[in-house]
């Protein structure tokens, strides 16, 4: 097995230094926002995620090598083109995973940890889940091993992907050059992803390359006309670590217990917010209501403008 390092472990000192720099900068820059308790929660979740990975990651590793034994190709570890290829392929499957994590409640129950902060800063990037293995997030990578990518190769590419995503968790950077914004994931694009504003819900799933969102219709640009609200639809309003980690699992268990038998599975695999009686709001229903209201307001403005024009015409004095 090739001995490849874990890039995220080597980056820990960099994480600590840059979070500290941004935290102190927030005292002098209004657009950079930090809360001490929120930051402590994020860092605790990040630390716990490392230990959770050590304790449970063996399941994902075993599954990876099992699938790799039945690979249909052999991607050489020593070929330069193989490393370029693995970064693109890994990022594509990351997009699939990330989209699934927002559309399948079972997977969302783990991923929600990352979105539960009402702040958006470098500390938020370290707010990672503890239950990823249990949520089966590793399943989304299995096709790569079947295609012939060595598990160590995929793990290294995944680490680089996470490292890239670290710097985009900030409000300190507005926009990158236009060409960069067109191809790469950026702070602007990822702010949209973390927003709870109806126009931004379930958008911009990219890891490194924003091209996947552009290709598959999930891209939404950031607009300066609307202030971004961060967090989740029903924010935690708590800094309790265990509640932050398990609140969605608890909610899902309650729904599973009380739901009619014919709907129980749906509470696991349908999107967050789905309910069998339509009593809750999903991202689709929230966005649909927003679009309806937006359309009503547009018609109202047009009608008001038309009435104003008619009144102005009637008020014009007649010539002698």
Outline where the language-model segments fall.
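N-terminal Rossmann-like or analogous alpha/beta NTP/dinucleotide-binding catalytic cores
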Residues: 50-73
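Central hydrophobic cores of alpha-helical transmembrane segments in multi-pass inner-membrane proteins
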Residues: 14-24, 61, 87-92
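Hydrophobic transmembrane alpha-helical segments in integral membrane proteins
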Residues: 1-15
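Cytosolic/stromal cytosol-facing helical appendages immediately following the last transmembrane segment
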Residues: 119-124, 170-319
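Membrane-interface helix-loop junction between the first two transmembrane segments
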Residues: 20-40
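Helix-boundary and loop/linker segments of multi-pass membrane transporters
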Residues: 3-4, 32-38, 72-77, 113-114
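Membrane-embedded catalytic scaffold of the fatty acid hydroxylase/desaturase
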Residues: 47-56, 76-230
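Loop-to-helix transition at the N-terminal end of transmembrane alpha-helices
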Residues: 10, 33-50, 79
């Amino acid at each position: 097995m090739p001995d490849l390092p874990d890039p995220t472990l080597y980056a820990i000192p960099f994480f600590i230094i840059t979070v500290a720099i941004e935290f102190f900068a927030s005292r002098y820059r209004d657009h950079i926002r930090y809360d001490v308790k929120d930051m402590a929660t994020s860092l605790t979740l990040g630390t716990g995620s490392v230990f959770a990975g050590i304790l449970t990651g063996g399941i994902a590793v075993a599954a990876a090598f099992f699938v790799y034994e039945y690979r249909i190709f052999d991607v050489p570890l020593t070929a330069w083109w193989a490393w370029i290829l693995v970064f693109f392929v890994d990022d594509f499957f990351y997009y699939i995973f990330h989209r699934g994590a927002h559309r399948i409640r079972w997977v969302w129950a783990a991923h929600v940890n990352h979105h539960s902060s009402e702040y958006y800063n470098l500390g938020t990037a370290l707010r990672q889940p503890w239950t990823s293995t249990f949520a089966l997030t590793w399943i989304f990578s299995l096709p790569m091993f079947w295609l012939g990518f060595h598990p160590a190769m995929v793990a290294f590419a995944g680490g680089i992907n996470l490292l890239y995503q670290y710097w985009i968790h900030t409000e300190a950077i507005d926009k990158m050059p236009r060409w960069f914004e067109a191809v790469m994931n950026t702070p602007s694009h990822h702010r949209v992803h973390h927003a709870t504003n109806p126009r931004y819900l379930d958008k911009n799933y990219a890891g490194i390359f924003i091209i996947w969102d552009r290709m598959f219709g999930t891209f939404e640009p950031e607009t300066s006309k609307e202030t971004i609200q961060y967090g989740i639809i029903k924010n935690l309003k708590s800094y309790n670590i265990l509640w932050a980690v398990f609140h969605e699992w608890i909610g899902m268990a309650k729904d599973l217990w009380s739901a009619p038998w014919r709907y129980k599975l749906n509470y696991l695999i349908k999107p967050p917010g789905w309910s069998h009686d339509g009593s809750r709001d999903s991202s689709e229903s929230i966005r649909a209501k927003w679009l309806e209201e937006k359309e009503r307001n547009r018609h109202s403005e047009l009608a008001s403008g038309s009435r104003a024009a008619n009144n102005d015409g009637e008020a014009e004095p007649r010539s002698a």
